[in-house]
Amino acid sequence: ALVIGSDIVTNAEQAAHVNGMLAHADETDDSHAPSLSHPGCAVVPAAMAMGEREKASGTQLLRAVALGYDLCARINLSLHPYDFRQAGHSTHSFGPSFGAAAAASLLAGLDYKGMRHALSYTAQQCS
């Protein structure tokens, strides 16, 4: 997968990570105020990298991004984000991690069990 703004091609995981860092680098990333999150800098790079790897169509990519944004917001909202943040946890990375995992899992064609495992792994990484 391509690292945006360069001619570097690497695996999907590394491209998603680098592109996510680039998306957040200038602090102009999107915000979802009710969930205290920035979904785009995690969801979009993960979806683009996996979409490139899997040769996804534009429709498939948009569907995955929409799923990622939705899950990101719902996860954070379910945790009562202001209380979650007050307890010392990062709302900016928690929900977006789940959104990125869901988007990438959808594009990878994982079945229900595979997606469940991917989200379980995400929960372990966020804890």
Regions found by a protein language model. Name each.
Residues 1-127:
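N-terminal core-entry segment
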